[in-house]
Design a protein with these regions (language model features):
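Histidine-acidic metal/acid-base catalytic patches
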Residues: 1-139
Length: 139
């Protein structure tokens, strides 16, 4: 399941919206794909069961990438959000893997992955995602 070709093969096994997948913006970019185009392809087939909304900087697909703040990476998250709105996507958008911010560090809050943030970072991610949704809805 590590390539877009594998995703397409898997989703072609059973032609049903119940045969869907989690669309992860970051993983899609880590594979070297265009998250907006992949979102469009999956969404037009009603195959997105859940969205993981995160951003990355990729230096070498599959091998060398860094997770970054939602507003600071190579994924066109606003483009993805506009595509989800265009599709009238009705399910969950989860802004995952918050990055560490000062207030979390000062409180000693740590997460299970390198550079991961805590409560304030989660709030930042949710607020940023919600604002992006509102902006996409007004366009």
């Amino acid at each position: 399941m590590g390539t877009l070709a594998h995703w397409r093969e898997y989703l072609g096994l059973v032609e049903s919206p119940f045969n869907g997948m989690t669309f992860d913006c970051g993983v899609t970019r880590e594979m070297g794909e265009d998250p907006v185009a992949v979102c469009r392809w999956l969404g037009e087939r009603d195959r997105i069961n859940h969205v993981h909304f995160r951003n990355v900087v990729v230096r070498k697909p599959y091998v060398d990438y860094t997770e970054v703040f939602l507003d600071d990476g190579q994924v066109d998250l606003f483009g993805v959000m506009k595509e989800l709105v265009r599709q009238k996507y009705p399910r969950t958008i989860y802004p995952e893997h918050p990055r560490a911010i000062d207030v979390d560090r000062e409180r000693g809050i740590k997460n299970q992955y390198p550079g991961g943030g805590g409560f304030a970072a989660e709030i930042y991610n949710v607020a940023y995602t919600r604002a992006m949704l509102q902006a996409a809805l007004t366009r």
